[in-house]
Each structure stands twice: as structure tokens, then as C-alpha cells.
């Protein structure tokens, strides 16, 4: 890729464990809600929406973060909320103060932390017919 396009993707890393900012800790009037599941680190991945591949570029970066985190024994989770709310004036002001460029669209966030070993794991059931093998 041309170096100009490679430089467009931006990652803003927030140490949310040290944050007392209510924007990250609460949403609306539900005090129990936490959009990043109380993870100690939140990575906000954004890009200029001027190219059709901007979202895919961010998705690839996020997936690579998931793979790297897993290799280090760190849990990860894709967070979508900022992708749909980043252009709300209050949210935009807040994420710009964190370092997200004003002309960027947020395509996803990554919550990183160590999994709670006591938390029950949900068994994933793959529905029949959702995978097709073409020979």
C-alpha cells in the first residue's frame, strides 16, 4: 500500500483501569453497564473513511491484536459501540480528547485483559448448515 494510506489507521490505547472518566465507565443511567467489560486496556481503532477498505484495514489490525493477545495469554473482546456512536457530538469531543483524530471513523475497539478463571464459559454451538465446503 502507498505510505499515505498506511498512515491513516490510528490506534488510541486507553489504560481504563486508571481511568476515572465516566464516559468509559457508564452509559446512560445504567450504573452496572460497562461497554468494555471492565477490561484494564481499551484500544480504539479508527481510520479516515475516505477509502472503501478503511474498515477492513482496521478489522485486520484488530484480528491481529486478538491473535497476539491470545499468544501471550491475554483475553480480548471486540467492542462495537463506538463505531455507531463516534459521531455523536459529546462522544466525538471525548474520543478526540483521547487522541482519535477528528476526521476518523471508529471501526472497532479491543478490550484487553486477563480472563477471570472463575467465569463460566459458554459452549459455542455451531448451527448446522452454516459452513459449506466447496470441492
What spans do the regions from the language model cover?
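Single conserved hydrophobic/aromatic residue that forms the stacking wall/gate
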Residues: 1-13
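Short acidic (Asp/Glu) patches
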Residues: 19-30, 90-94
Amino acid at each position: 500500500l502507498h505510505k499515505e494510506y498506511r498512515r491513516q489507521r490510528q490506534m488510541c490505547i486507553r489504560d481504563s483501569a486508571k481511568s476515572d472518566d465516566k464516559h468509559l465507565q457508564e452509559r446512560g443511567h445504567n450504573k452496572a453497564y460497562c461497554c468494555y467489560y471492565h477490561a484494564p486496556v481499551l484500544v480504539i481503532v479508527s481510520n479516515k473513511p475516505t477509502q472503501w477498505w478503511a474498515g477492513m484495514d482496521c478489522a485486520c489490525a484488530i484480528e491481529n491484536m486478538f491473535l497476539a493477545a491470545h499468544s501471550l495469554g491475554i483475553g480480548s473482546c471486540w467492542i462495537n459501540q463506538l463505531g455507531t456512536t463516534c459521531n455523536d457530538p459529546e462522544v466525538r469531543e471525548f474520543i478526540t480528547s483521547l487522541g482519535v483524530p477528528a476526521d476518523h471513523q471508529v471501526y472497532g475497539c479491543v478490550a484487553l485483559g486477563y480472563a477471570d478463571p472463575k467465569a463460566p464459559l459458554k459452549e459455542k454451538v455451531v448451527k448446522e448448515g452454516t459452513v459449506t465446503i466447496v470441492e
